[in-house]
Amino acid sequence: MPQFTAIREESTFVDLQGVTIHRYRWRPGRPKAVVLIAHGLGEHALRYEHVAQRLVQAGYAVWAIDQRGHGATGVTQHGGDLERLGRLGPGGMRAVVGDLVHVLKQIRAEHPGLPVAVLGHSWGSLSTQILLNGYSDLVDAAILSGTAYRMPGSMNPGDLNARHAHLGDTGYEWISRDPAVVAAFAEDPLTFPAKVLPLFGVADGLRLYGVPRRIDPPIPMLIAGGSDDSMAGPKSLRRLGDAYRSRGGLTDVTVTVYPGARHEILNEINRAKVLDDIVAWLDARLLPA
């Protein structure tokens, strides 16, 4: 087991619809920038403890929340009924994005003058794309992990495990080549299948689709994923990068595809390399030369 050294602070806030959101923070002694992590569908923020620890080691403060219907937020929201995890509650996807905006404003207030990046994975990366369409002024850099170009034909709405089902019987073989990661996901009481329509309904499911709007001032963006990601894949990542250049007006867009990696590049067998790449990318763009 990895040895974690940074203390995790846990707190809550109540959002505009009255939902109690659980928030986590990890801080180095003197942070040089801040990263907000937005987790994916069917999981929770504490699956990113190792990511937070690596970023703190590199000098970054890290914030994360258990988003609507997920993790400790979902448990509180649904009165401890784990069968209801994934249901977003009042406000739906708009409230999900609103909660991220609220946290970004908190970060700006607590860390004035420091650069702020968002690291969104999977559903969290789609929420980040939606956020950037309206609140890019709160963000100095964006990392989209396990993401997709949010248009039909570029994002898989079906069974994400279909092409990996022959590799095991958990239903989660699609997330990583690391059997320990797959087993831990299957055994975690706070994880569940990422089935958008049954959980979100049609209206909020459709809100996941869209295209980039112009981002002014432009920010640097890293789009990263695995070549064997069944949610989208390399072609979708490149289309997304092209869209952020042409529609979003961004000039610093990096698209990185990790050969053989599945959906969760941050939990893949090459995760140390992925995290090193992310730290190097952040350092090059957020820190003074």
Residue ranges, per PLM feature:
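Serine-hydrolase catalytic-loop signature spanning alpha/beta hydrolases and amidase-signature enzymes
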Residues: 40-50, 62
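Alpha/beta-hydrolase-fold enzymes
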Residues: 119-198
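Serine-hydrolase catalytic core
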Residues: 177-250
